[in-house]
């Protein structure tokens, strides 16, 4: 997984992108990688607020408008570093980012430079279900158009229930099955159906704490820490499945 870049992209806001980005960063740190993190969200820079992850806040707005030119430094860094790079992008950044990537053939540029790009996106149930699914479709279309080696990791956020499409679970949909060469895997973030788990994770996210900080904090009791560890360890286990071969090869 060295020399890889990870963009978290979804056009629908409030679906858990920053949580996914922070969990992903912690996963790679736990697995022993050097990680560089960045946040491009001009509206709600939640990822940037995780101080322990040393996230860089990238300026992409000029005169109150997102400027594609300001994406240049980000992708130049992705092309030049050997670190595992994780970039969280806000909902308002989704369309400008996709246009920049397509206009500048960035998927091919990264591939030609020997980099492996993973795009992470979030799928949910509830009112945002169709919007998040459409976002996944757009990402796959972009990758197909450029015929690159870019892979997609789908985070299935089950907070609003398990998403079902025309009676089928996500992994049985035509979009997933028909694009198995692009889909690296699905990482479920399960709903524990417990107000205790929900409250604990909410407290962690509102304080912008990492799992390691929670373990050392006196603000969480032993049982709460156990619940929080279970949530993150389950996600790490799912990511091991998603990236299994690559992680093993690095070891």
For the regions a protein language model found, what residue spans apply to each?
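Short amphipathic alpha-helical segment that frequently serves as the phosphate-/nucleotide-binding helix
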Residues: 18-23, 133-137
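Conserved catalytic-core segment of NTP-binding enzymes
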Residues: 95-199
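Nucleotide-state-sensitive switch-loop elements of NTP-binding domains
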Residues: 2-7, 30, 34-94
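Glycine-rich phosphate-binding P-loop
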Residues: 8-22
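Amphipathic coiled-coil/heptad-repeat helices and related helical stalk/stem segments
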Residues: 21, 67-71, 132
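NTP-binding/hydrolysis catalytic cores, primarily Walker-type P-loop NTPases
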Residues: 198-251
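Charge-biased, low-complexity intrinsically disordered regions
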Residues: 24, 178, 228-229
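Rossmann-fold NAD(P)-dependent oxidoreductase module
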Residues: 27
């Amino acid at each position: 997984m060295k020399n890889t870049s990870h963009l978290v992209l979804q056009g629908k806001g409030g679906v858990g992108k920053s949580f996914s980005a922070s969990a992903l960063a912690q996963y790679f740190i736990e697995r022993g990688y050097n990680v560089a993190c960045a946040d491009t969200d001009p509206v709600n820079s939640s990822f940037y607020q995780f101080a322990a992850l040393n996230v860089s806040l990238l300026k992409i707005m000029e005169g109150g408008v997102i400027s594609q030119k300001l994406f240049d430094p980000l992708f130049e860094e992705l092309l030049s570093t050997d670190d595992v790079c994780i970039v969280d992008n806000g909902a308002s950044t989704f369309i400008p980012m996709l246009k920049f990537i397509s206009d500048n053939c960035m998927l091919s540029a990264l591939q030609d430079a020997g980099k492996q790009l993973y795009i992470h996106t979030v799928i949910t149930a509830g009112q945002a279900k169709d919007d998040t699914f459409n976002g996944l479709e757009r990402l796959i279309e972009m990758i197909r158009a450029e015929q690159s080696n870019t892979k997609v990791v789908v985070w299935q956020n089950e907070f609003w229930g398990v998403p079902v499409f025309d009676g089928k679970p996500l992994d049985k949909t035509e979009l997933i099955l028909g694009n198995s060469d692009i889909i690296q895997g699905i990482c479920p973030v399960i709903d524990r159906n417990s107000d205790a788990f929900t409250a604990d994770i909410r407290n962690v996210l509102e304080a912008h704490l990492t799992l390691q900080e929670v373990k050392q904090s006196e603000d969480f009791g032993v049982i709460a820490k156990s619940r929080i560890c279970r949530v993150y360890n389950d996600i790490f286990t799912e990511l091991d499945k998603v990236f299994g071969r690559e992680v093993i090869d690095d070891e």
